[in-house]
Amino acid sequence: MAAELLFNCEVCVQVRSQACEERRLNVRVNVELLSISNPVHKKDLAVRLTDDADPFFLYNLVISEEDFQSLKSQQGLLVDFSAFPQKFIDLLQQCIQEQNKDIPRFLLQLVYSGSVLDHTPVSLNVVETNPFKHLTHLSLKFLPGNDAEIKKFLARCLKCLKEDKMTLEDKLRKTEEDFTRQLSYTQQSLSEKSRELDKLKNEWTSYTAALTSKHTQELTAEKERALQAQTQYQQQHEQQKKELESLHQRSIQQLQNRLSELEVINKDLTERRYKGDSTVRELKAKLSGVEDECQRAKQEVVSLRRENTTLDAECHEKEKFINQLQTRVAVLEQEIKDKDQLVIRTKEVLDATQEQKVILEENTEKKQSHIEKLETTIKSLSAELLKANEIIKKLQEDLKTLMSKLKLKNTVTIQQEKLLAEKEERLQKEQRELQETGQSLRMKEQEVCKLQEQLETTIQKLEESKQLLKTNENVITWLNKQLNEVQMLKRMETPSSMHGGIRTALSPHGMLERPSFPSSGISHTISPFYAFQKFAEPAHNKNPSPHCPVPKIQFNSQVSKIDQHSDVQVVTAATGHPANKENGDNLGLESKYFKKKEDSIPLRGLSQNTLNSENLKPYLPKVQPSLPAAVTTTSAYFPG
């Protein structure tokens, strides 16, 4: 005989009886299909009603094909025996779906014909409710289980409980082994990560201290240089103004003297009148040229002032950039502190899990001892039950012969029933305790899963912090490189091709003087422009050590023709870098930091057309082939 389980679930049932009021009861409905092959192949439908809280609640129903035909004719069913089990299960599922509602559409009713204690047949009705009428779709009669069936049912329940207990013990052992391995591995990884964090902290503190000291020194040096350059520019502008005014006054006096001489000559010599007028016109043209030169000199003063303002703005931008870097360093220190706190929290959580593990082990030992005691009690109960069965058989045999001793035997049976009831209560308590231990084990498994997730998150955060530290180190190295490039300015080379009365010399602060013209009284200087830009280092400059770079400046001067405008440009080459930094990589920064500024104004020289060529001839140098100038590039701040 083979049994196929079709349905096994708890259903809320409405219990009706004549002796007591209506009440609701959770009943487990078990539907099985029994196939019998000896001597004829048959299929029977077995339905069993049980209560998990009451082990003596047992009602059975076995429907064969012949019984179903009579049931079909009595209740007017339209389904064959092969489709009846599925339809019955569908009705039960509809009852389960509707049982939590206030007014369910489908109900299961368990109706007792007599009292509950009489062990009379019970009818199970599937009822559909509507506002007009209650319709019974199906009504099945169940027989109460006898002592043998109840004993079989109890033995089956005990067997299932033992199997569940064995599986739970195996799971406990496996989980304990897994947890011990995982805890040992996590402890090792945590110790390694804590060591790495300590090393990183020490390196970071030393590195930040060195950086702050370097940056402060460099800032003070740059500020002093900017102030010195500003004072020098102001002094030079004042000197140029005074010289131009004196030259203008001298030229005016000379012209007035010549005019007076020409008037005397006109009075004396009327024949040379036209020549005097021509000389007067020439002198007027010279006056206009001198005035144009004065206006151009004023324009140069205005352009120099603008350049001073641009340099001040660049200094302010660099100070802002340094402040931003200091704020970034503070943010990174705060992130490191937060990660330290996270590590401390994870350590606390691990300690708590270890304590919980110890408590769980103690509880499991207690439960195992308690289960062993329960097994001994169950064995004693089974032995007592066997003895009780033997006594009952003997009493049944003696009933036929000894009617006079019925009262005494009845008292003995009552006492035995009391003992059985007490034993059954103990069994129920033990079943409840087993359920509670299973629930506690599930809770502990969930807690362990949560702890594993927390450990994984902490490991991910540690990896992210390492990546952040690497990016910060790259940013700091780039900043050091930029600040070193700003510090290193190259010296200016004096041109060797100048001749005669033209003076070309560097002032103590890097100023280049223009040639002075004593006949006209004009003498002014050229102010250099420092461009902070990287160039490729020549091969012969790679020998100095990277720790002590020597600044070098390239200057290319050319003397143009007298009738053309001359532009003076000073180009500064980049300082020598260490061998490993010649390529000038950007270290992950954006390209906006390397863009050129195109709003600067170049320095233009005074026009030489306005000067008298006859006065300048003895002071002009002979054009010589100049030395090959170094390769110059346009400045990022002063192009063109």
Curated annotation (Swiss-Prot):
What InterPro entries does the annotation carry? SAS-6_N, SAS-6_N_sf, SAS6_CC
Under Pfam families, the record lists: SAS-6_N, Sas6_CC
Keywords in alphabetical order, please: Cell cycle, Coiled coil, Cytoplasm, Cytoskeleton
What's in the GO CC field?
Answer: centriole; centrosome; cytoplasm; deuterosome
| PISA domain: residues covered | 40-92
Cross-referenced Gene3D superfamilies: 1.10.287.1490, Spindle assembly abnormal protein 6, N-terminal domain
Q: Which GO terms describe its biological process?
A: centriole replication; spermatogenesis
Where mainly located? cytoplasm
Where does the protein end up? Answer: Cytoplasm, Cytoskeleton, Microtubule organizing center, Centrosome
Residue ranges of coiled coil: 154-475
Q: How does it assemble?
A: Nine homodimers form a cartwheel structure with an internal diameter of 23 nM and radial spokes connecting to the microtubule triplets.
Q: What does this protein do?
A: Central scaffolding component of the centrioles ensuring their 9-fold symmetry. Required for centrosome biogenesis and duplication: required both for mother-centriole-dependent centriole duplication and deuterosome-dependent centriole amplification in multiciliated cells.
Notes on the domains: The 35 nM long coiled-coil domain mediates homodimerization while the globular N-terminus links the dimers at an angle of 40 degrees to form the inner ring.
What PANTHER family does UniProt report for this protein, alphabetically? SPINDLE ASSEMBLY ABNORMAL PROTEIN 6 HOMOLOG (PTHR44281:SF4)
Listed name of the protein = Spindle assembly abnormal protein 6 homolog
